[in-house]
């Protein structure tokens, strides 16, 4: 225990120095306008540390609060978080889903009460098959969406019970309904008009996707919006994600030449 404490005391100033070095590297560079977060690895982190399932999502919830502050302070205007996929919504055991939704609700309560939302004028929205969520959670979501509806400086989008394929399918169905009802003609159908049928028609394309836990995939996350995203995969599990990991992701983004498919 004493050895671990000594090691921590020794590494802390080195960590802070490295954080400062990274900050000096990125502070004057271009920032992504829209950052997408896939916070993966809560359960594996808990298992490796002999912690409970509840601990896994508690520390994941705490980390998300911390990272959102980092992103807002950095100046990121649009943030989308992959909170819960449709696959997990449908396949996870009920006791685990209960824990997950408990901390989602706690996070929504924080958004209702935290002055940082008002300070940065963060507009909050939620996308996905929200009808699958518990009614009390839906009520909290509606409250925070309504409370922040007039803010326009920043935007936080929560993807809950969300799947990229399902969103595109739902958009196609709505488009076909409008076509059958004469509300749109074939010549008017293009990328711009198609976007209007998504869950959030105002959601911008994502510039940078950050995924934790070492998994190198996007897992059905906003498939349309990540078509030209830069991807950054971090080895750390989500509860271990540090500010230097975020700075590294930003530095990586700044070093890339974006061709948008050209």
From Swiss-Prot:
Q: Which gene encodes it?
A: uppS
Give the matching PROSITE patterns: UPP_SYNTHASE
Where substrate binds, per the record, is at 41-45, 85-87, 92, 211, 217-219
Its recorded reaction(s) are: geranylgeranyl diphosphate + 7 isopentenyl diphosphate = tri-trans,hepta-cis-undecaprenyl diphosphate + 7 diphosphate
According to the UniProt entry, what is the EC number of this protein?
A: 2.5.1.89
Spell out the coiled coil positions from the record: none
User: What family is this protein classified in?
Assistant: Belongs to the UPP synthase family.
Gene Ontology molecular function terms on file: magnesium ion binding; prenyltransferase activity
What does the note under cofactor report? Answer: Binds 2 magnesium ions per subunit.
Extract the Pfam families matched here. Answer: Prenyltransf (PF01255)
Under what name is this protein listed?
Tritrans,polycis-undecaprenyl-diphosphate synthase (geranylgeranyl-diphosphate specific)
Per the entry, what this protein does is: Catalyzes the sequential condensation of isopentenyl diphosphate (IPP) with geranylgeranyl diphosphate (GGPP) to yield (2Z,6Z,10Z,14Z,18Z,22Z,26Z,30E,34E,38E)-undecaprenyl diphosphate (tritrans,heptacis-UPP). It is probably the precursor of glycosyl carrier lipids.
InterPro entries assigned: UPP_synth-like, UPP_synth-like_CS, UPP_synth-like_sf
For this entry, list what GO says about its biological process: polyprenol biosynthetic process
Class in the EC hierarchy, top level: transferase
Active site at: 40, 88
- CDD domains hit by this protein: Cis_IPPS
**Which residues hold Mg(2+)?**
40, 230
The cofactor required is:
Mg(2+)
Assembly information from the UniProt record = Homodimer.
What top-level branch of life does the organism fall under?
Archaea
Assigned keywords, A-Z = Magnesium, Metal-binding, Transferase
């Amino acid at each position: 225990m004493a050895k671990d404490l000594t090691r921590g005391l020794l590494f802390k100033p080195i960590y802070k120095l490295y954080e400062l070095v990274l900050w000096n590297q990125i502070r004057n560079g271009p920032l992504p306008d829209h950052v997408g977060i896939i916070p993966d690895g809560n359960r594996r982190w808990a298992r490796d540390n002999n912690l409970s399932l509840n601990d896994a999502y508690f520390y994941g919830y705490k980390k998300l609060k911390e990272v959102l502050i980092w992103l807002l302070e950095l100046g990121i205007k649009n943030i989308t978080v992959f909170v819960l996929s449709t696959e997990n919504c449908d396949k996870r055991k009920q006791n685990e889903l209960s824990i997950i939704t408990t901390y989602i609700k706690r996070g929504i309560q924080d958004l209702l009460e935290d002055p940082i939302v008002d300070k940065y004028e963060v507009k909050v929205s939620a996308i996905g098959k929200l009808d699958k969520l518990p009614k009390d959670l839906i009520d909290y979501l509606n409250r925070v969406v309504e409370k922040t509806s007039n803010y326009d400086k920043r935007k936080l989008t929560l993807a809950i019970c969300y799947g990229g394929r399902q969103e595109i399918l739902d958009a196609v169905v709505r488009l076909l309904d409008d076509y059958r009802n004469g509300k749109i003609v074939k010549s008017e159908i293009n990328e711009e008009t198609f976007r209007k049928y998504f869950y959030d028609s105002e959601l911008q394309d994502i510039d940078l996707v950050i995924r934790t836990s070492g998994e190198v995939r996007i897992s059905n996350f906003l498939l349309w919006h990540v078509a030209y995203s830069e991807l950054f995969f971090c080895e750390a599990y989500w509860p271990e994600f540090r500010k230097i990991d975020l700075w590294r992701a930003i530095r990586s983004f700044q070093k890339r030449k974006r061709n948008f498919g050209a």
